[in-house]
Amino acid sequence: MKRIILILTMFLVVGGLSAQEQPMKFLGISMNCTMNTFVNKLKGKGFTQEPNDNHPNTVFMKGTFAGEKVKLEIRAAAKTHLVYIVVVNFNRSTSYTYENLKTTLLDKYGDNNKEYNKLKEEDKYAKFTTDYIVWRLNEDSETHQCNRLVLSQCSYRANFPLVLSYIDGKNSIIDLQEVESDF
């Protein structure tokens, strides 16, 4: 009986260990590493490091991502130096469409079944949102244009650079705990 309980306990422990959340990856590189290790692996993929003027725990790099020239901003926790965010800044002149990029990312990473980046009707205004763009069309403004946008009867163009953020939840919590421990 003890042997059966021991075997069951071992299966539960091993199963629990294998079910732990995997760290975020960027270009196949795990973000659960130090800044120097992460930067060296990116250099191996053709990225070059840019000068950094007074931005502690941050590295800037240039390279190619999704077939486009981009600039990366990589941040790490101050004490552990673990990477917790990679921000991908596309060139302002990069020609892309929202739907093409969305399809590319969904093909690579799958759908998380959450509704993002949709037009929404609200009491006072219609709002189109991405992580970085918010358009608010008040009732007092041109309601005809607002209705056309909501009904998808017109196209729109945002003249903003595209920014993608890869955030490792575990390492960002470590960074937050380090900051809180300083106070």
Task: Indicate where each model-derived feature is located.
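Small/flexible residues
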Residues: 4-5, 77, 104, 138
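Accessory recognition modules or surfaces
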Residues: 24-25, 29-35, 53-79
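Non-cytosolic coordination micro-motifs
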Residues: 20-55, 90-183
